[in-house]
């Protein structure tokens, strides 16, 4: 059989892994991998038991040690069940909200959740549910691409007294306020418009309005019952559904697919963010960055931010509203690779309480060694929180010295890469593929390869010098210090220091000499 769902008579089979991968992890988890050990550590604060798989045969042959393996398996089952208990309220609320079985809900994507919710509401409104698109329709839809969301590229540098504003539920608000729906489209001389709400209120905006109102109601109740897990789950599910509508309308396999609607939502989103920028600059403030539904404004006080918000909100249609996301002490934007302009979606902030918020840097990416992530995070913390640039530079030099002296634990040198297909299916052999194939262990799509770069032999490529972390640890194989210094640590901090006027030579102590130095 080709079925991928397990049916157990009299039992509901819930696939927690798929639910976490498709829905929960997208907004809630920071872990680099969805292995049980990592997910349990983040959600429960507890990890799997250690077990030496290389000795499993010997352990099972001896009755006195077989219980070790049993306890290991029991702990895995216990962790999985406790994760399920944490997620049950969320699963139950989605199930009730869209009218589908828990077994099916646990395997759905966000788009499927949104579609089932619309179908449920459509039946209530006595409307006709469109058919699923044919294969030819899907192929035709795939050829059409909308212009993306608005991004105002930042200027690299460090800024102080930054205010961040964002639209509350921007895309859902646009759909409602402009009555955007496949049923309300009006084609006027090649342009697209939408019927006024006074003529007909579209199905999609009416459903969205009910979702937003239900979420407001649930949040209000939650204030009086802060420990009510059902209400917490309901708020999360309604947010998931509301935010999923925009992506759903542009999803090629959707029943209510509407290319024009998705394009209109994006265009109006760009227009409203541009209006915020124009108004802020008109009032004499500098906008340093804007992205999708938010804007970063420098050298502005909280009082000035509140006045700006009030002025802009007075011009917005209901239910659109611009909110103050926060006021921050300092912000740092780095250059895009090989460009003078700043990198998009890559910045770090220090809030009023001294907390560091990092977006887009290696500290939040899975394909860098922990030593690079830790070094970068500490550099950002010293610069933004402590305002100590020289201290940050000294710290990096100490890390480089520790790596060169092999004082850094092997655990911090491990690099994790998730496979998109079976290891044997890759045409080009990258570092992680080489490590996977040379180990003799079978790695499939979705698996995470954990490996290190070793010194190896002269003439070997980096790929040839990559081996699985477990093999390196078991055989006491050393990492290659120069690789981790030059390909991990220095690249992770160089862009930060360059913005502040430092070069790679300032970090390594090896400055390039000019003719004037002789």
Where are these regions (language model features)?
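Low-complexity, acidic/Ser/Thr- and charged residue-rich accessory regions of DNA metabolism proteins
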Residues: 436-518
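Active-site-proximal helix-loop-helix substrate-binding element of RNase H-like nuclease domains
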Residues: 1-77
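Hydrophobic alpha-helical scaffolding
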Residues: 26-29, 70-73, 107-108, 160-164, ...
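C-terminal polymerase-core module
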Residues: 298-469
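Short beta-strand
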Residues: 286-290, 324
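Common nucleic-acid-contacting/processivity interface regions adjacent to the catalytic cores
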Residues: 57-169, 173-176, 229-271, 275-279, ...
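Catalytic nucleotidyl-transfer cores of nucleotide-processing enzymes
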Residues: 1-9, 21-23, 131-132, 136-249, ...
């Amino acid at each position: 059989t080709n079925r991928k769902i397990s049916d157990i008579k009299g039992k509901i089979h819930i696939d927690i892994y798929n639910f976490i991968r498709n829905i929960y992890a997208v907004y809630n988890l920071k872990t680099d991998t969805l292995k049980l050990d990592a997910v349990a550590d983040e959600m429960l604060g507890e990890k799997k038991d250690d077990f030496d798989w290389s000795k499993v045969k010997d352990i099972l042959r001896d009755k006195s040690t077989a219980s070790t393996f049993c306890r290991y398996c029991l702990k895995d089952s216990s962790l999985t069940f406790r994760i399920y208990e944490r997620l049950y309220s969320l699963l139950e609320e989605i199930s009730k909200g869209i009218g589908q079985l828990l077994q099916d809900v646990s395997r759905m994507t966000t788009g499927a959740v949104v579609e089932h919710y619309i179908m449920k509401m459509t039946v209530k409104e006595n409307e006709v549910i469109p058919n699923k698109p044919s294969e030819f329709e899907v192929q035709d839809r795939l050829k059409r691409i909308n212009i993306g969301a608005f991004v105002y590229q930042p200027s690299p540098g460090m800024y102080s007294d930054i205010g961040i504003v964002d639209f509350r539920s921007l895309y859902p608000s646009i759909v409602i306020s402009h009555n955007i729906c496949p049923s309300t489209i009006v084609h006027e001389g090649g342009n697209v418009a939408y019927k006024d709400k006074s003529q007909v209120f579209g199905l999609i905006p009416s459903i969205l309005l009910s979702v937003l109102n239900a979420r407001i109601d649930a949040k209000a109740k939650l204030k009086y019952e802060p420990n009510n897990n059902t209400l917490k789950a309901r708020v999360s599910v309604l947010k998931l559904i509301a935010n999923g509508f925009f992506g759903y309308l542009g999803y090629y396999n959707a029943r209510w697919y509407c290319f024009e609607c998705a394009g209109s939502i994006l265009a109006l989103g760009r227009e409203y963010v541009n209006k915020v920028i124009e108004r802020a600059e008109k009032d004499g403030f500098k906008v340093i960055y804007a992205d999708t539904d938010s804007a970063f404004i420098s050298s502005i006080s909280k009082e000035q931010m509140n006045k700006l918000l009030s002025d802009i909100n007075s011009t917005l249609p209901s239910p659109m509203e611009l909110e103050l996301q926060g006021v921050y002490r300092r912000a740092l934007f780095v250059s895009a690779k090989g460009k003078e302009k700043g990198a998009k979606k890559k910045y770090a902030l220090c809030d009023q309480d001294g907390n560091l918020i990092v977006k887009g840097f290696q500290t939040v990416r899975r394909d860098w060694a922990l030593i690079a992530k830790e070094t970068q995070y500490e550099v950002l913390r010293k610069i933004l929180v402590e305002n100590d640039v020289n201290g940050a530079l000294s710290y990096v030099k100490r890390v480089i010295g520790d790596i060169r002296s092999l004082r850094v634990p092997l655990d911090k040198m491990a690099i994790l890469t998730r496979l998109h297909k079976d290891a044997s299916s890759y045409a080009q052999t990258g570092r992680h593929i080489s490590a996977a194939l040379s180990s003799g262990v079978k790695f499939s799509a979705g698996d995470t390869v954990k490996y290190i770069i070793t010194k190896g032999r002269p003439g070997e490529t980096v790929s040839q010098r990559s081996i699985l972390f477990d093999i390196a640890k078991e055989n006491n194989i050393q990492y290659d210090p120069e690789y981790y210094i030059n390909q991990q640590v220095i690249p992770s901090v160089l862009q930060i220091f360059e913005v502040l006027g430092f070069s790679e030579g300032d970090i390594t102590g090896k400055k390039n000499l000019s003719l004037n130095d002789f």
